[in-house]
Amino acid sequence: MTDHSHENWRPASNPWAVAIVVTLAVFMEILDTTIVNVALPHVAGSLSASYDESTWVLTSYLVANGIVLPISAFLSRLFGRKQFFLICIVMFTICSFLCGIATELWQIILFRILQGFFGGGLQPTQQSVLLDYFKPEDRGKAFGLSSIAIIVAPVLGPTLGGWITDNYSWRWVFFINIPVGIVTVLAIYQLLEDPPWESKSKEKLSVDWTGIGLIALGLGCLQVMLDRGEDEDWFNSNFTRTFAVLTLIGIIGAIYWLLYAKKPVVDLHCMKDKNFAVSSLLMAGMAMILYGSSVVIPQLAQQDLGYTATWSGLVLSPGAILIVLTIPLVLKLMPIVQTRWIIAFGFACLATAFFWSRTLTPDIDFETLVLFRSAQSIGLGFLFVPLTTIAFISIPRRLNADAAALFTMFRNVAGSVGISLSTAAITERSQAHSAHLATHTSAFDEPFQQTIRELAQAIQNFTTQVGDPTGIATGRMYQAMIEQSRFLAYVDVFTILSVVALLLIPFCLLLSPVKSEGSAGAH
C-alpha cells in the first residue's frame, strides 16, 4: 500500500468509541501510579515489612514502567498494535489481581514490576491510536479527552486509595482494576484495528537487543536514583553515585546507538521535527511543574497543616475540575489564536500563580489553599491540549508510534525529576531557613529573650500547674521556628517553579506557526 493511501486510511469503528475505551485503560494505569502511595503503611504492616522496604512497591513499578515507554512503539510493531494493547491490558489486570493476593513483600514487588512493564505500553499506544484514528482538525478534541485521564487520575489516586484502605483493605487498591480491565479488553477486541502500515510488520522486524539493553540500563537506573535518592542522602551515598554513573552510561550509550544503528529499537527521526522537539521540551517542563507541585502541596497540607489524606486530596480536586472545564475554551481558541501564544499564556499563568505563594502565611486556610491550586490549574488548562496537538501536527503517520512513545517518556521522566527535586528542595531549604532563624534564638538576642519572658508569663498567668514556664515557652518558640522554616521552604519551592515556568515562555516562540484546519491549527 502506498504512502498516499496510508494517509487516506480511515478506521471502520467510531473514533470516539475507540478513544473512550483506550483512554479508560490509560486512566486505570495512571491511577495505579498514585493510588498505592497512601496504602504503603498498611501494606508494610500486613506483610511484616518496614515502611522503607515497602517503598520498593512504588519504585519497582516506576522502573519497569519507565523502561517500556520508549520501546513501546517497537513492541507495537512486533506484535501488532491491537494485539500488543490487549496483551498489556490483560497482563496488567492479572498482575493487579496477583498484587492483591500477595502474602510476601517480594511477591508484591515482583508483580508490581510486571504490572509496571505491561502498564508502560498503554499510554504511548493510546496516544498513537488517537493520532491515527482522528483527522488533524479533530485531534485537539481527542487530546482533550486524553488530558482528562492524565490530569484527574493522579489527583484521584491518593484520595481514592485512602478511602479504600480506610474502609476496606489495601488489597482492594489492586482489585478495583479487575472489572475495568475486563471491560476494556472486551471493548478493544471489538473496536480496535491495526492501521495498514503496522499490520503484520513483525515479519520484517529484527530485535535491537543492544538498544533495549542501553535504554533499560539508563532509564531503569535513573528511576531508581530519583525514587530512592532522598532516602539515600543523594550524592553523599555510594548508592546514588553508582546509579548516577550507570544512568549516564546507559542514556549516552542509548542515544549514540539509536542515532547510528541500522535498525534501532526507537526511531529518533521525529526529533528532527522542530515543533515536536520544542513541544517535548515544553511538555517536560510542564510535567516537572505539575508533578512536583502535586506532591508538595499535599505534603504541605498533611504534614504541616494537619489535613487527612482525604482533605489533602480535596485541595487538588477543584483544580483538576477547573482544568477539565478550561479545555473546551482552549479548543475554541485554537482555530483563531496561534497555538504558541496560547501555550505562552499558559506558562505565564503558571508563573504568576506560583509567585502568589510569596504572599501566603503559615496559617493558610483550606479555601486559600484551594484557590492557590486552582490558580495554577488555569495555566495548566492552557497547556495540555495545545502542546500535544502542535507536537504531532507535522509528524508522518509512520512515525506516530515512535513519536508518541518519546513524548510520553519525556513527560513521565520529567515528572519524576520534578517530584524528586521538589521534595529534596523542601528538606534542603528547610534546613537553611532553620540555620538562619537559629541565629536569632541565642541567649544574647534580646528580642528573642523578651519574647520568651512574655510567653512564659502568659503561660504562668493561664495556669499555675506548670513546672517550668520558661522551658515550655522556649520549646514552643523553637517549635514555631521549625514550622516557620518548613513553610518558608515550601514558598521557596513554589518560587522556583514560578521561575521555571517563566524561563519556558521564550521557548514557545520557537514553535513554528502551522496552518491547518480546525483545532489542529497553530496558524
Model-derived regions, located:
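Transmembrane-helix exit segments and adjacent C-terminal regions of multi-pass membrane proteins
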Residues: 1-26, 193, 256, 263, ...
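Transmembrane core module of solute transporters
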Residues: 13-73, 77, 85, 96, ...
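Transmembrane alpha-helical cores of Major Facilitator Superfamily
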Residues: 27, 59-63, 90, 144-152, ...
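Helix-loop-helix hairpins in multi-pass membrane proteins, especially solute transporters
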Residues: 69-212, 228, 237-238
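Small-residue-rich alpha-helical segments with characteristic i,i+4
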Residues: 147-150, 155-158, 293, 369-453
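A membrane-interface helix-boundary motif in multi-pass transporters
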Residues: 166-178, 228-240, 308, 427-499
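C-terminal membrane-cytosol helix-exit motif in multi-pass small-molecule transporters
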Residues: 179-197, 216-228, 246-260, 507-512
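Helix-loop junctions on the cytosolic side of multi-pass membrane transporters
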Residues: 186-205, 256-265, 362, 428, ...
